[in-house]
Amino acid sequence: MVPNANSNTVSLQSPNAIPPRTSSTGYITPFPPAKSVLRPVPESDWLGQNNTRNRSSSTTAIPLTGMHATGPQDPARYETEDLNYTSRKTWSEQKEKVLVGPFEYLFAHPGKDFRTLMVNSFNAWLEVPQESLDVITKVVGMLHTASLLVDDVEDNSLLRRGLPVAHSIFGTAQTINSANYVYFCALQELQKLKNPEAINVYTEELLNLHRGQGMDLFWRDTLTCPTEEEYLEMVGNKTGGLFRLAIKLMQAESGTPIDCVPLVNILGIIFQIQDDYRNLSSPEYGQNKGLCEDLTEGKFSFLIIHSIRSNPSNLQLLNILKQKTTDDEVKRYAVKYMEGTGSFEYTQKVISILVDRARKMTDELDNGRGKSVGIHKILDKLVV
């Protein structure tokens, strides 16, 4: 029977009164239960406390910035109200800053700007008009930064260029929205070229970028070790996508009939393999992104694939990837293991062979014109 809530004489048993302990055999402990240290609380009191608590919590709401009181509103105004806000251009600079906040945060802390260096080096051959080159350089920078925002979310990264990742500051949802917004801002910027081929290039390479990223994530999340050939295809889509985007846009705006895409494809592969190598060996890389971040991400990089496939019966490295460890000692052990399988030495040899191959392609494209200095400097930076 439920006590009358209006009665002031009905008391409830104190909540810390413990019943006799009964064993699994039904034996009841002979010791009397401890007396309550709390006095019985009348039901009207604890009901009143609950109401008070609800009232107090409702009056401590945090005020919203930019809010102000409005007078009574007539719902009939929606019969004639102009709801076409886009045509009235109500979008403000302040709202724009909200959207691009995560993008501008990362953009304000640039990396080594490898892509701008590449654009300028290839332009020695392609001789793109400066106005078009400015648009292309801006678009490539926007896409690169936006893609890094998404990468950091998908990889659960903590650091980017030695600073907290954008989604640790702005939140995951706002960061993803900002990156997606910038993808379309870049497309809008590209329309200034008034070149249909530029739009085709943009669409094709953005598709390739997401295809490569999708496979990279699939292997990580399903703990599936790809072959080297599958890895190279992924890199050609993911890393090579933005490289090709820049050069193919330049070719679309150039009057020089030269096809640089095969060379750019090789550069993209070298760049990614070299990045994988540095991730597991470079102290500078560790300071900017964390020690051996690929191991923490559970990523199947070039060295890790080689090491696992060198001895498939040993599951230690695969299990370390599965743990996505943040333990530095475990990561150092993994590096030692990969050294034992010859993966670092193998990667150095592959990079050396690919760099030599790229140099030969560069000299063939240059054909003695003396305009390949910038490309050779890029290749110098990719040697490990």
Curated annotation (Swiss-Prot):
It is an enzyme of class 2 (transferase). Residues 47-62 have a biased composition (Polar residues). GO terms for molecular function: (2E,6E)-farnesyl diphosphate synthase activity; dimethylallyltranstransferase activity; geranylgeranyl diphosphate synthase activity; metal ion binding. The gene is ggs1. Disulfide bonds: none annotated. Isopentenyl diphosphate binds at residues 112, 115, 144, 161. Pathway: Secondary metabolite biosynthesis. Transmembrane segments: none annotated. Keywords: Magnesium, Metal-binding, Transferase. It catalyses: isopentenyl diphosphate + dimethylallyl diphosphate = (2E)-geranyl diphosphate + diphosphate; isopentenyl diphosphate + (2E)-geranyl diphosphate = (2E,6E)-farnesyl diphosphate + diphosphate; isopentenyl diphosphate + (2E,6E)-farnesyl diphosphate = (2E,6E,10E)-geranylgeranyl diphosphate + diphosphate. Its EC number is 2.5.1.-, 2.5.1.1, 2.5.1.29, 2.5.1.10. GO terms for biological process: alcohol biosynthetic process; isoprenoid biosynthetic process; mycotoxin biosynthetic process. It comes from Hypoxylon pulicicidum. Dimethylallyl diphosphate binds at residues 160, 238-239, 272, 279, 289, 299. Gene3D superfamilies: Farnesyl Diphosphate Synthase. InterPro entries: Isoprenoid_synthase_dom_sf, Polyprenyl_synt, Polyprenyl_synt_CS. Binds 3 Mg(2+) ions per subunit. This is Geranylgeranyl pyrophosphate synthase. Mg(2+) 3 binds at residue 275.
